């Protein structure tokens, strides 16, 4: 299994357990799902209509996004202006890291990042933003949106802003 960790904070952001697609040469998108967590209701596959006393009562469960929950991502908020301020600083920091490690990737990163940021800004109200567990303000912000069907959530992380750790 490969864990994708933030190059600045070391926070775990995603793993290859999710179906990951590369977009614009700079983004990894992974579909995720809303899942129930908590409570002590264990589904053993029995038909609930044949069981007595099976009421739909609050049992301490909550519905969460599986990626957000699994990697303990923390919600954060932006308006367009603050997002643009953040993303400019973040892109500059990633570019500096690339200069050290992989200067040949800089043109691809700059071009692809510009295209993807325009997509995000174009549909800004539809996006949700999360930080890693450490909530490091200089680290990557994980972006979450929904596919065209309106029900399938996906997360987006910057390919050049992660280290891959094989475990």
UniProtKB/Swiss-Prot annotation:
GO molecular function terms attached to this record: calcium ion binding
Q: List the cysteine pairs that form cystine.
A: none
What does the UniProt entry say about where the protein is found?
Answer: Cytoplasm, Cytoskeleton
Gene Ontology CC: one annotated term: mitochondrion
In the record, biological process GO terms are: cytoplasmic translation; negative regulation of autophagy; negative regulation of microtubule depolymerization
A single Pfam family it belongs to is TCTP
The TCTP domain extends over: 1-167
InterPro entries on file? Mss4-like_sf (IPR011057), Mss4/transl-control_tumour (IPR011323), TCTP (IPR034737), Translation_control_tumour_CS (IPR018103), Translational_control_tumour_p (IPR018105)
Instruction: Write out the function statement from the record.
Output: Involved in protein synthesis. Involved in microtubule stabilization.
Which family, according to the similarity comment? Answer: Belongs to the TCTP family.
Q: What is this protein called?
A: Translationally-controlled tumor protein homolog
Tell me what organism the protein belongs to: Candida glabrata (strain ATCC 2001 / BCRC 20586 / JCM 3761 / NBRC 0622 / NRRL Y-65 / CBS 138) (Yeast)
């Amino acid at each position: 299994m490969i864990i994708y960790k933030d190059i600045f904070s070391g926070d775990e952001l995603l793993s290859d357990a999710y179906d990951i697609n590369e977009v614009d040469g700079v983004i990894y998108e992974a579909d995720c799902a809303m899942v129930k967590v908590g409570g002590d209701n264990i589904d053993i596959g029995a038909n609930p209509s044949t069981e007595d006393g099976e009421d739909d009562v609050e049992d301490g469960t909550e519905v969460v996004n599986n990626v957000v929950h699994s990697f303990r991502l923390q919600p954060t908020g932006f308006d367009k202006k603050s997002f643009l301020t953040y993303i400019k600083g973040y892109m500059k920091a990633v570019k500096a890291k690339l200069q050290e490690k992989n200067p040949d990737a800089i043109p691809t990163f700059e071009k692809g990042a510009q295209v993807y940021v325009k997509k995000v800004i174009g549909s800004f109200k539809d996006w949700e933003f999360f930080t890693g567990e450490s909530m490091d303000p200089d680290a990557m912000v994980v972006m979450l949106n929904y596919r065209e069907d309106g029900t399938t959530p996906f997360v987006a992380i910057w390919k050049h802003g992660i280290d891959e750790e094989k475990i």
